[in-house]
């Protein structure tokens, strides 16, 4: 009766197939290509967080966090501040300097 109809699996529609193609590519590890792409993205920004970089590059936040640490070690970025959630990085050339004392 009705059980036979429920046992049949629904064939995926064209729209569902399109949705599956829209998923982000899963990159399990940090590659040199990914670091180079991030270096170009960071150079254009005034500041960057792991979330902001993840959105721009289409990767997970954990991967973006690792990439930012690598760029900090290379001297491309400077850790400006860290709160309980995410660090804020500045490109090395855009780090604010304090005015001289006594002026």
From Swiss-Prot:
Instruction: Show the GO cellular component annotation of the record.
Output: ribonucleoprotein complex; ribosome
Q: Region Disordered: list its residue ranges.
A: 1-23
**Taxonomy, superkingdom:** Archaea
Record keywords: Ribonucleoprotein, Ribosomal protein
Q: Which InterPro entries match?
A: Ribosomal_eS25, WH-like_DNA-bd_sf, WH_DNA-bd_sf
Recorded hits in Pfam families, A to Z, give: Ribosomal_S25
Q: Where are the transmembrane segments?
A: none
Q: Does the keyword Ribonucleoprotein apply?
A: yes
Similarity annotation: Belongs to the eukaryotic ribosomal protein eS25 family.
Q: What is this protein called?
A: Small ribosomal subunit protein eS25
* Provenance organism: Aeropyrum pernix (strain ATCC 700893 / DSM 11879 / JCM 9820 / NBRC 100138 / K1)
């Amino acid at each position: 009766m009705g059980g036979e109809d429920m046992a049949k699996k629904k064939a995926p529609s064209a729209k569902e197939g399109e949705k599956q193609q829209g998923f982000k590519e899963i990159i399990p590890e940090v590659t040199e290509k990914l670091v180079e792409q991030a270096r170009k993205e960071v150079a254009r920004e005034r500041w960057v967080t792991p979330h902001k970089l993840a959105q721009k590059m289409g990767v997970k936040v954990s991967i973006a966090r690792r990439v930012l640490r690598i760029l900090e070690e290379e001297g491309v970025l400077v850790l400006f501040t860290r709160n309980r959630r995410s660090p804020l990085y500045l490109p090395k050339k855009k780090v604010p300097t304090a005015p001289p004392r006594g002026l």
